[in-house]
Amino acid sequence: MFGALKKAFKAGAKEVQADYSHNKDYLEAVCAAAALVANADGEIEDSERSKVERVLSSHPVLSKMYQQNIIAQTAETMFKRAKDASGRQALARELDDIKGRDDGKMAEDVYLIALDVANADGELEPQEDAVLKKIAARLGVDPTRFEF
């Protein structure tokens, strides 16, 4: 009996390790989506950087999974990529990296964090809404499921 229990624990530990091996992709996808939303009007202002930093650092899951400096570094990398078309396409590819993982839950979480970033100032701009729709399409997420 204990041998079977030991095997079950080992198998569970391997699953947890497999889940954590994707964490870098998750953080990169979150920061890519946030950068795309922040750049919706074609430029990322200091206030938008602060808004993204505030949303990401206070997010209950992200703040437990990643150190603040890692979140900030990753976000800054994604902000730099958002400056031109090839960089924005690279950001879109970051979204592809998590599409379909965890039965789509990871993609939904990325979309919801992008929505939080867009709504952080209390106003969803038309450009931000358009980018959110593109993010949802890229992730294979139905945004109408989150209209609460």
Language-model region placement:
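Small-residue-enriched hydrophobic alpha-helices in membranes
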Residues: 1-36, 43-148
